[in-house]
């Protein structure tokens, strides 16, 4: 019987993945990250603009809560959004063309964008740009990323790379667009955000129309039948599949890794949020300060690609530790950049190291904290593959469990939700702490950011040594 199964699996040719339908869905997912994480990555522009104009009576600490709340809501609501994706599917239809999860996310995102254009007070920005936009973004991201994961298997690395690029490209384009509108064309803040809303509106309509799961094929049915033909009940397979996630949640190495990445998140966003205000304080023009955010995000995209190849050669844990530690050291050198060339170099260097993400996602599938992929939602994805085998051991025999393991790439497993929640709290309080420290100068801010990253790197190093104590080993 086993020989028959093996022959059947060997002879079964995988279906073509880059079809017209799947390619259009991939473009829709790219747009989802462009409009959500790409826009979030541009918050440094708003930090500087709000402090200089609309919210000039408020401190950097107060204004930083807007971006921190946005980050928190995206991470926090990834958990319930993930549960709904697990239960009803990423684009489950009440009617043929109604896709409630994506539709809710699109409506909330568009509504928040237009509501921001009416904001005058800090609490209004917190409600619109912090809470409502964050919730909408979470419900756009999760279905989009889940759909790509389910559409692509053999070419998942390329598909995820294209999708994730949307966040970096958004982080480059949005600051340039905002600078052109606010600083050069003299468009009012209200109309600037209305223009942003009119840009996001057709993109959201495109997402809702195109992000659809692949129809079930005979290949899928045959494979599921093969996997359930060993004489064991489906409940037995589910019980075996549950052992993997339960085991890794109790794994000390995984817990130390999550702790390290959460600690690093406290300082991770500080340069991204405050580099524009730092540049203007050093005498750089407002336009160049806006462009620094684009430069930082552009460098993060380069780092995301190149470090993926290095991770394949030298090991995932090793690169994870080195990039977090490098980010911490660069952050501590922040205030040594006092002229135009130095500040640009700092933005490029920090963007490169903090934007690390695996490029070969097929060989090294991302783990619980892929972020949501945008800029620096933490370098942890490269560390997950070393732990994946422990999960897959209990899951590979059942298609439903194996699908659940794939969906963990976009935060929908119990492992992913628990680790993402810890990141949400770190992201919530980390940047406001940076804003509070600004009254003591940017040196205090840079030391805080660097210390948090180095402390997180230390915990990641402990997790790495638990995997293999040999310093030169590929882990």
From Swiss-Prot:
Q: Where in the cell is the protein located?
A: Cell membrane
The UniProt keyword set, sorted, is: Cell membrane, Membrane, Transmembrane, Transmembrane helix, Transport
- Lipid metabolism listed as a keyword: no
Main location class: membrane
Q: Which GO terms describe its molecular function?
A: transmembrane transporter activity
Q: Which residues cross the membrane?
A: 26-46, 65-85, 98-118, 125-145, 158-178, 189-209, 255-275, 283-303, 329-349, 443-463
GO CC term, one of those recorded: plasma membrane
In the record, the note on similarity to other proteins reads: Belongs to the major facilitator superfamily. Monocarboxylate porter (TC 2.A.1.13) family.
What protein name does the entry list? Leporins efflux protein lepC
